[in-house]
Each structure stands twice: as structure tokens, then as C-alpha cells.
Regions:
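Short, charged N-terminal beta->alpha structural module
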Residues: 2-21
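Active-site environment of divalent metal-dependent phosphoester hydrolases
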Residues: 11, 127-130, 169-171
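A short, well-structured beta->alpha microelement
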Residues: 20-37
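Short amphipathic alpha-helix with an adjacent loop that forms part of the alpha/beta core around
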Residues: 33-41, 133-134
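Cysteine-nucleophile active-site neighborhood
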Residues: 43-111, 120, 179
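Conserved hydrophobic/aromatic beta-strand scaffold that supports enzyme active sites
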Residues: 101-103, 150-152, 162
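Catalytic beta-strand/loop cores that center a nucleophilic Ser/Cys/Thr
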Residues: 110-158
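Acyltransferase
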Residues: 167-185
């Protein structure tokens, strides 16, 4: 079972729909999380949402408690939140990307995806990872071709993955392939 933690975002319903193609999905609001469901889940997904990771201390507690015990995936705010919990600074971008399609490229040969591969993805974010960023076992694996902003990370050892973009968006080509690969890792 996949347990989605919803950060009050309309995209969460699309995320749930996409994940349901691969497994049973349960979804609860971040302030009504069920520890019983977390324990039953094979994967925890931190959804997109408004604001900054610092606005969701409950999500930080969940991440820290289950890190290394459950596979985790962060999407958009969820991507930022995982990195924030790992000590990263999340900052405003000069340009806001809401409903914007970008080309991103796999830049790391340790990635689950083939280095050099290019994907078209849907972006809906005004914040980004401030770099350089270093944390044990975390590798930036995809970047925007134009801006070089980090678009994905992987921590294979602890099975923690993140996408700054929205794999469930109609702007993302082959989003199901990306999710399936992460879920099967």
C-alpha cells in the first residue's frame, strides 16, 4: 500500500490517481496522519502543496521517524521537504514556474534512469533547492536543461526519492514510467 500525505493541494488527487495504477493507495491530510496506515504502507509519498517546508512541522516529524524504514517519495513541496529535513536551504526562484513545461536531463550515472536521457516535465513551483547541497547518500540525479536547477534526487540506500516537477501532470511526458521505476526500485 502507498500512503500519500496531502499538503492541501489540488494536485494530490492526480498523484493518488497516478499511484493507484500501481498499488492500493490511502491518502490523508498532513495534520490527520494515521500511524497505523503508515506502518501498513510500503511507501510514503509527500504530496505537493502551497508554501514552504517550514510550514509543515508534522511532515518533518513523520519523515524523521520513518526515514530508512519506509520507501519515501517527495513530489514538488514533498521534494523540497525531504531536502529541508536533510539540512538544505529552500529558496525563492527568480522566475516562478506554474504550469510550465521544461526539458530536464538525467545528470548522474548512479541514477535509476539512464544518464543523458531527457524528459519533458510539468513544473509548478516558486521555490528551489539552494546549491551546493551535500547530504549522506543523496544524489541530485536530474536537472533542468536551461537553468540547471535540481529536478530530482535519489537516496538508493534508504530508498528516498524526489521530484521537483509533477510526474502526474499532463505536461510531463511519460510520468507513469518515472513513477513505476521509482516504485519498483
Amino acid at each position: 500500500m502507498i500512503y500519500v500525505i496531502d499538503h492541501n493541494d489540488s494536485f494530490t488527487h492526480n498523484v493518488v490517481h497516478q499511484l493507484a495504477l500501481f498499488d492500493k493507495v490511502e491518502c490523508d491530510n498532513y495534520n490527520k496522519v494515521s500511524e497505523k496506515k503508515i506502518k501498513q504502507a510500503s511507501t510514503i509519498v509527500f504530496s505537493p502543496g502551497p508554501g514552504s517546508p517550514k510550514n509543515y512541522p508534522i511532515t518533518s516529524k513523520i519523515y524523521k521517524k520513518f526515514k530508512g524504514k519506509k520507501k519515501m517519495i517527495g513530489i514538488c513541496l514533498g521534494f523540497q521537504h525531504i531536502l529541508f529535513c536533510e539540512g538544505a536551504k529552500i529558496i525563492e526562484q527568480k522566475k516562478i514556474y506554474h504550469g510550465y513545461q521544461s526539458n530536464i536531463q538525467v545528470v548522474n550515472n548512479k541514477s535509476l534512469f539512464q544518464k543523458g536521457k531527457i524528459f519533458k516535465v510539468g513544473r509548478y513551483h516558486s521555490l528551489k533547492l539552494k546549491e551546493p547541497f551535500k547530504s549522506n547518500n543523496f544524489e541530485i540525479t536530474m536537472r533542468c536543461l536551461n537553468s540547471k536547477v535540481a529536478m530530482a534526487f535519489e537516496n538508493k540506500k534508504e530508498k528516498i526519492y524526489g521530484f521537483q516537477f509533477h510526474p502526474e501532470s499532463f505536461l510531463t511526458i511519460n510520468g507513469n514510467v518515472l513513477i513505476k521505476k521509482i516504485l519498483s526500485a
